A protein has these predicted regions:
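Beta-lactam-recognizing serine transpeptidase/beta-lactamase-like catalytic domain environment
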Residues: 1-14, 22-404, 408
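Short, gly/Ser/Thr-rich active-site loops of penicillin-recognizing serine hydrolases
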Residues: 262-266, 424-440
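Amphipathic oligomerization regions
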Residues: 401, 411-430
Length: 440
C-alpha cells in the first residue's frame, strides 16, 4: 500500500503562514501593528490578491498578526514577507532585512523539506529555491521547443536527433548567462538550425518568457509567503512542523514507536516569545470570529490551528485523448476533422518516435498544429473536470501547553474546512484518553 502521509508531498497553502510570521517576528515585526489589506497588488500585469478580493472584491481592512492569521489574509503576509506596507508604500522598519532565505531557514528549523526519520520510506518534500525555479523554467522551455520543433527549426536539423538534442541543450544553457537579445539572436544564427525568419521571434521568447524570469522576483516572495509555488511537504512533515512549533522550535524527531518521556526545549527566550505569539495568533482561528470557531465552540480544550487549501494543477484525465477529442473536437477546433487529427498524430509518431511514444501526446500535438486557432493546453482540456484542491488543517492542543500536534491533508478535499473536523476528533479523542479534563 502507498503511504500517503509519508510519501505524498504537496503544497501546504496557508498552513505555511505561521512560518512566514515567525521569520518576520525574528526580523522585528510588531505583531500589534495593523496593516491595511488593499485587496491586491499588481506586479507586471499579474494580480496577487487576497482570497476575499478574488472572490468578492472586498478587503479585510486593517489587520494585525492575530487578525491576519484568523482571516488568513494573504495581503498581510505579502507585506510582512517583504518588510513593506504595500498599501502605503512605507517600509515596516524591521531591525534585520527579511529575505526568502530568512523564511526558508525557519522552515528548515521546523523540519520542512527534510525527512522526518520515521521508520518508513518517506519523501523529503521540497523547499522552494531559486535554482529549483531555474530548473523548472528550463524544463518548460525544453518541452515547448520539442513540442513546437517543426515551427521553429529547419527540417534538415530535425533528422539527426542526437545532434538536435545537443543543440537544444545549448539553448537551455544560455539561461545561465546574462545575454542580451542581440547576443541570443547572434548565437541562434551561428548554430544555424533555426528557420531564418523565426530567429528573432525565438530569441525574444527565450529571453523574455524564460531567461529573464529565472531569478527570484517579488511575485515569488508573495507565493512563498502563503505556501504556494514550489513548496511540497508530506503530512508527516507538517505534523513534525507543528510539533516543533509547540516545542519552542525544537525538533524531537518522529517515530512510530510509542514511548514515554518529557517534553524538552532548548529554545532561546526570544524564540519562545516569538513562538508564543504565533500560537496565540493561531488560537484566534478557533476563537471568536475565527474560521473554525463554529467547529470548536464548546470544545473542552483550547486549540491553536491553521487551515489551508492548495490547488492541484491539471485536469482529471479521460480514458484516452482519442476518445476525448472524438467527442469534443467539433467544439474545441471546429476548423479541423477528427480523421485529420488521427492522420497527423500517426505522422508525428512515425517521424519522431523519440518524442511521441504514446498516442495521447501525439493526438494533442496534432490538434494544436492543425487548427488555425491559437489554441492552448487550457483550450484543449476545457471539457475535462479539474482536480479539487488539497484540504489542510494543522493544530496544536491545548494551546497554552501543547501536548499533541495534528496535521490532516485530504486529497481532493476541496476546502480546508473539510479537514478540520478530522483534527477536532483526533484532539478530542487524545484528550479523553489522557484525561486532560483533570489537567487543563
Amino acid at each position: 500500500l502507498y503511504h500517503v502521509a509519508a510519501m505524498s508531498a504537496v503544497q501546504p497553502g496557508s498552513t505555511f503562514k505561521p512560518v512566514t510570521a515567525l521569520a518576520a517576528l525574528s526580523c522585528g515585526l510588531n505583531p500589534q501593528r495593523a496593516l491595511y489589506d488593499d485587496g491586491r497588488i499588481l506586479l507586471g500585469g499579474r494580480s496577487y490578491g487576497c482570497y476575499l478580493w478574488n472572490d468578492s472584491k472586498k478587503t479585510h481592512g486593517y489587520v494585525d498578526l492575530n487578525g491576519a492569521m484568523k482571516d488568513s489574509c494573504n495581503y498581510y503576509f505579502y507585506d510582512i514577507a517583504s518588510g513593506k506596507d504595500f498599501a502605503s508604500g512605507v517600509s515596516l522598519g524591521y531591525e534585520k532585512e527579511i529575505t526568502n532565505d530568512t523564511i526558508l531557514s525557519w522552515a528548515k528549523k521546523l523540519g520542512l523539506g527534510s525527512k522526518t526519520g520515521i521508520e518508513l520510506s518517506e519523501s523529503s518534500g521540497t523547499l522552494p529555491s531559486e535554482s529549483l525555479k531555474q530548473q523548472g523554467l528550463q524544463r518548460s522551455l525544453e518541452e515547448k521547443l520539442l513540442a513546437e520543433q517543426e515551427y521553429w527549426f529547419q527540417k534538415s536539423a530535425l533528422k539527426n536527433r542526437n545532434e538536435f538534442y545537443k543543440n537544444l541543450k545549448k539553448f537551455l544553457n544560455w539561461s545561465e548567462k546574462d545575454l542580451t537579445l542581440e547576443e541570443i539572436i547572434g548565437k541562434l544564427k551561428a548554430i544555424g538550425i533555426v528557420k531564418e525568419y523565426k530567429v528573432e521571434e525565438l530569441a525574444a521568447v527565450c529571453k523574455y518568457d524564460y531567461f529573464d524570469q529565472m531569478a527570484w522576483s517579488q511575485g515569488d516572495t508573495f507565493n512563498l509567503s502563503i505556501g504556494q509555488g514550489d513548496h511540497a511537504y508530506t503530512t508527516l512533515q507538517m505534523a513534525g512542523y507543528m510539533a516543533a512549533l509547540g516545542n519552542g522550535c525544537q525538533q524531537n524527531g518522529l517515530t512510530l514507536v510509542k514511548q514515554s518521556g518529557t517534553k524538552t526545549s532548548n529554545a532561546s527566550s526570544s524564540a519562545k516569545k516569538q513562538v508564543s505569539t504565533i500560537i496565540e495568533a493561531m488560537t484566534a482561528v478557533t476563537g471568536d470570529g475565527g474560521s473554525l470557531q463554529p467547529l470548536f465552540a464548546g470544545f473542552p480544550f483550547s486549540v491553536a490551528a491553521k487551515t489551508g487549501t492548495a490547488q492541484r494543477t491539471g485536469y482529471i484525465q479521460t480514458e484516452s485523448e482519442r476518445s476525448y477529442f472524438w467527442r469534443y473536437l467539433h467544439k474545441i477546433a471546429p476548423d479541423i476533422t477528427f480523421s485529420e487529427v488521427v492522420e497527423e498524430a500517426e505522422r508525428l509518431m512515425k517521424t519522431y518516435p523519440d518524442l511521441y511514444q504514446e498516442e495521447d501526446a501525439a493526438i494533442r500535438r496534432a490538434v494544436l498544429q492543425l487548427s488555425s486557432a491559437d489554441l492552448t493546453s487550457e483550450d484543449l482540456d476545457q471539457f475535462k473536470e479539474r482536480y479539487d484542491g488539497f484540504a489542510w488543517t494543522v493544530a496544536l492542543a491545548p494551546a497554552e501547553d501543547p501536548q499533541i500536534a495534528v496535521a490532516v491533508m485530504l486529497v481532493q478535499g476541496k476546502s480546508s474546512f473539510n479537514a478540520a473536523p478530522v483534527v477536532r476528533e483526533m484532539i478530542g479523542k487524545y484528550g479523553e484518553m489522557c484525561e486532560w479534563e483533570k489537567l487543563f
